[in-house]
């Protein structure tokens, strides 16, 4: 299974990629929102791990773009971000984000959430 990690922090991308690669997933990485949309459309990931605050397009703009595209509309999304106000969480969930996790985060918790979402999405 393929997972796209979109975060402008290379440190966070490396940490998440290391955990998910150790779990056996193929990992794609994007450093900004526009690249995330492009890779989601071309790379066809099974799940996205997405930051909210990124250059070019923020995480909510990415979610909107992906949900409007039939090729990516049903891809599960985990929002992994420092933006955890009630307004941010409700905004993300309202756009169709399946999970909203705060930073700092537990890589093991992220791994379990990813596994659970992928199991639910499997045919």
What are these regions (language model features)?
Residues 24-31, 39:
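Short hydrophobic/Thr-rich beta-strand motif most characteristic of the beta2 strand and flanking loop
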Residues 43-49:
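Active-site beta3 strand of CheY-like receiver
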Residues 54:
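Receiver (REC) domain active-site loop signature in two-component systems and cognate sites
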Residues 14-22:
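Charged docking surfaces used in two-component/phosphorelay signaling
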Residues 105-115:
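C-terminal output helix
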């Amino acid at each position: 299974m393929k997972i796209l990690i979109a975060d402008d922090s290379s440190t966070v991308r490396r940490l998440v990629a290391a955990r998910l690669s150790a779990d056996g997933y193929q990992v794609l990485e994007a450093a900004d929102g526009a690249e995330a949309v492009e890779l989601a459309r071309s790379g066809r990931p099974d799940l996205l791990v997405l930051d909210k605050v990124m250059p070019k397009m923020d995480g909510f703009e990415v979610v909107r773009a992906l949900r409007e595209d039939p090729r990516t509309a049903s891809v599960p999304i985990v929002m992994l971000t420092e933006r955890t106000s009630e307004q941010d969480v409700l905004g993300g969930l309202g756009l169709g984000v399946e999970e909203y996790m705060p930073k700092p985060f537990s890589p093991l918790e992220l791994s379990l959430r990813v596994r659970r979402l992928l199991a639910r999405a499997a045919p």
